[in-house]
Amino acid sequence: MKYQLTAHEARVIGCLLEKQVTTPEQYPLSVNAVVTACNQKTNREPVMSLSESEVQALLDTLVKRHYLRTVSGFGNRVTKYEQRFCNSEFGDLKLSAGEVAVVTTLLLRGAQTPGELRSRAQRMYEFSDMAEVESVLEGLATREDGPFVARLPREPGKRESRYMHLFCDDMDTLITTVEALAPLDDDGDLRARVEALEGEVAELKARLDSLLHHLGD
């Protein structure tokens, strides 16, 4: 798929999507506001500690890739940023309000169950019931221009499967493989393979974050 974000880029875009809906009076965001949003200790998994220079580099990259744009009004000396990731005038990705809420929450908190998504996304969109959440997830998983989410195998002892977004370049293929194996995980060997793939996803993500941190030093 064409959306190939790093974990840090996903965090920046997720923050802008979130603040556009939850605090429209403070949007677009300055660099400092983006730093604060990225490093929030609530509604963020994992919690990050990005520096201003790291965030500025991320913003510059995302502007060049046309996922963000700068905004500078008359008399405003501070450059601000707004997202062009979805629902922009010339962008291809069009999402409903419910889809924006789900995608944003997945970008900010990683894999989650439909129940967790309904609870955590309620500041952005109030789902009428679980069926609506599941319908949105199904739509994102089967879109012709996607898929944008994938269902992970249900963990032992859990009632619901988790869903992961597919906008990051280090997890797309692996998550697709995990999803393909999910219906077969009654077999112990296949379950072990699925768990190994999930572990590889987490390891790749950690290595990418570490590399980005060193590049920013």
Curated annotation (Swiss-Prot):
NCBIfam families noted in UniProt: PRK11239.1
Pfam families: DUF480
Entry-linked InterPro entries: DUF480 (IPR007432), WH-like_DNA-bd_sf (IPR036388), WH_DNA-bd_sf (IPR036390)
Database matches in PANTHER family: UPF0502 PROTEIN YCEH (PTHR38768:SF1)
Taxonomic lineage of the native organism: Bacteria, Pseudomonadati, Pseudomonadota, Gammaproteobacteria, Enterobacterales
Species of the source: Klebsiella pneumoniae subsp. pneumoniae (strain ATCC 700721 / MGH 78578)
Stated name of the protein: UPF0502 protein KPN78578_10500
Gene3D superfamilies: Winged helix-like DNA-binding domain superfamily/Winged helix DNA-binding domain
UniProt family annotation: Belongs to the UPF0502 family.
